[in-house]
Amino acid sequence: MAISAAASVSAHRLDEYLQAARIGIEPDRVDIELDLTPGADVARRLVSEIDRNRDGVLGRDETRAYTANVLRDVGLQVDDRPQALGVIDSQFPGVDAMLKGEGTIHLRLSARVSGLAAGDHRLLFLNAHHADVSAYLANALVPEGARVEVITQRRDPAQRQLEIDYVLRNAADRARPPLAPTIIGAIALLAGLAWMSKRETSRSAG
């Protein structure tokens, strides 16, 4: 689930190439779900770019080549250090669906991030793919575990750039029970023992 969605992915203009990025931050990696949906008026240009042999079918080599082009236009940094993104999965619609403005390219990207200490961190995501005809959306996803907490998100007006401030906690901090409930529980236990002792004393006296 996205923490804050700026607009509806389904509502895009026919003359735009809608690119929606959802970014998941985990302690040792960053996952990016990138959905690319060309409107009907720009789809023919995109199909021509992907279908290099003009046979009306988006072949495996052609989709791999286009995915590589997208990857070159996308950037990721953590604490001002560039991170290498790799392709986990890619799904391409049929040509007919794309020409009707109904086809979405789904890309799953991931970067391994190592050596991060507990504390504050900043992620920067950049998307410069087909900037001349594109509309962009970018949002952080709710982290899967308790070790990562997203604090703020900042976007440029076009949403080609997204900065995410987040906090990374130690695994021990995540596992350690909160101090306040522990103290309250101890006080309650002592109070109960004192009450039972007083009750037994009263019975003995009676």
Give each language-model segment a name:
Residues 189-200:
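Alpha-helical transmembrane segments
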